[in-house]
Amino acid sequence: MKVQGSKWKVFCTFAPMKEAKIINDPVFGFIKIPRGLLYGIVEHPLFQRLNRINQLGLASVVYPGARHTRFQHSLGAFHLMSEAIVSLQQKGIFIFDAEAEAVQAAILMHDIGHGPFSHVLENTLIHGISHEDISLLMMEEINSCFNGQLNLAISVFKGDYPKNFLHQLISSQLDMDRLDYLRRDSFYTGVTEGNIGSARIIKMLNVVNDTLVVDQKGIYSLENYLTTRRLMYWQVYLHRTCVAYEKVLVNMLTRAKDLIKAGQDVFASPSLHYFLSNDVDAQWFSKHPEALRNYEELDDSDIWSAMKVWKHHEDKILSTLATDMLDRRIFKVEVHEDPIPEERIEGLHIKIAQQLDIPVEDAHYLMNVSTISKDMYNVEDDSIAILDKNGEITDISEASELLNVQLLSKKIRKYYLCYQRFE
C-alpha cells in the first residue's frame, strides 16, 4: 500500500538510535523504548490513535478503573517481548538483532487495527474483516512511510518467517499479548485473582525445533495462568452487565445505520458517517482506499460525541438508546443455560412496543438475544508444549497433575437475553 500523499510525511523520518526513551508504566514500572525505528512507531499518528481507544471497551460500567487504553497495553506487550528476547538469548537461543527489533515492532503494532471500543463494534461498523487484517493494512502503510524497514516485522507478524517461535511470541497460547492484558486488566479492574506470574512464565520459555516450549519448572505458573484466564473471561470480559451495555451500543449504531439508509439525517463525524452509510467488509476495503483512511480517523470519541447529539434526535428509538448509553440505563439481562423460547422473545417485542409506543417490528432495537460460548484451552488449536528434564516434549494436558484440562477444554455456552427496562 502506498503512502497516502504526504499525509504521514513528517512522521516518516526519525532520529538515529541514541539513548532509550523511558516511559513510566503503572504495571511494569519503567519501559525502555530504543530511539530509532521502534520509537518512530510509537510516535506515529496511527499508534498514537490507540490512546483514544479503551482496552476493555465498556467494562468501566462495572469496573470504574478499567479505563486503560490499547496504547498502554501495546507498550506493556512490547516490554514483555523485550524481556522474553533477553531470556531466550541467555539460554543460547540465537536471535539476530534485526529479528529482535522486528518482533518488538510487530508486537507494538499487533493491535493497531482496533476500532472504537476495541472488539465491541467489529461486526457493527464493519463485518467480514478482523482487526488483525486491518492491523496488517496499517502496518503496510507505516512500512511504506518507513521505506520498507518493517518488512521483517510484517513477515513475523503474518507467520511467514522461518523461525516460527518468533510468531508464537506474538500470537499463541503464551504470547506477550495475553501475558500483558491479563496482568493489566487485573490491575485496572481490581480483580486481583487475575494477576498472573508473567515474569516467571517468560523466564521458563525455551525453544525446541523453532517451536516455543516451557520448561517443566514453569508448569505450576502455567496452571495458574490458564485458570486465571478462565476467571477473567467470565468475571470481566463476559460479565453480564458489560455484555448488556455493549448490546445497547450495538443496537444504537444499528438504528443509526438504518435511519441513514432510510434517508434520515443523523449527525456523525465524517469518518463515523462513512461507516454508518456503507456496508463495509473486506472486499469494500480492497476496492475503496478511502475506507482505511476513514477507519484511521475513528476512535471512541466519535461514538461518544454522536451519542450526545442523538440523545435529542426526533427518532424515539435512537434517542432512547443514546440516553441509555449516556445515563447508564443498561438493558436488563438474563443468562440462561438453554436457548430463549420464541414465545418469550415475541412477548417482549409486544411489551417493548407498548411501553415506547413504537411499531412491534421495531422493538428488536430495544432488545438482544445472543449466544456466547468460550473454552480456555484447545489442544488441537494451539497447544502449550512442556519440555521435561529428559528433553521430551509433552502437552500440558498430559504433563500437569493438577490441571483439569477437560474442564478448561469444555466449551461453555450461555444464552443472553437483554432488553429495555420497563418503568
Stretches with model-predicted labels:
Residues 109, 113-114:
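Short active-site segment of divalent metal-dependent hydrolases/proteases
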Residues 11-102, 116-122, 126-423:
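Histidine-centered, transition-metal-coordinating active-site segments
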Residues 103-108:
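Short alpha-helical catalytic segment bearing the HExxH-like zincin motif
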